Amino acid sequence: MVNIHIKLNENTIMYIYRNITEKLQRALKIYPVVLIGGARQVGKTTLVKNVLANQGYNYYTLDDRSTLLFAQRDPQGFIENLSGPVVIDEIQRVPELLLAIKYVSDQDPKAGRFVITGSVNPMLLPSVADSLRGR
């Protein structure tokens, strides 16, 4: 069970259980790439950080300027240099990463290798949709 932390004020935190938790855990056992999409500020990042906190995932956010610049400059190199299972947050900022993820996951389709989050569904991007179907 995972809870979402909501800070009500400086001293009070409320926890909200999310039903998506079990679905995420099941998907991580089946698929090499798991996408968590949704509108801004709905708890995607918090969900992922809580669910995967003790599972050995390395977390990368494309809100970090240096991470963003590296990913934009060399999407394939960025993905190939990641170690272990990874979370890439805000994937919509560098959609070219999706093709690199496809390539790497085709080479090694280990379940749960990539968890990506974003506020734009990459499957709606014409250049990406066909490449990632079924992953």
Please place each PLM-identified region on the residue numbering:
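Phosphate-binding site recognition
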Residues: 1-135
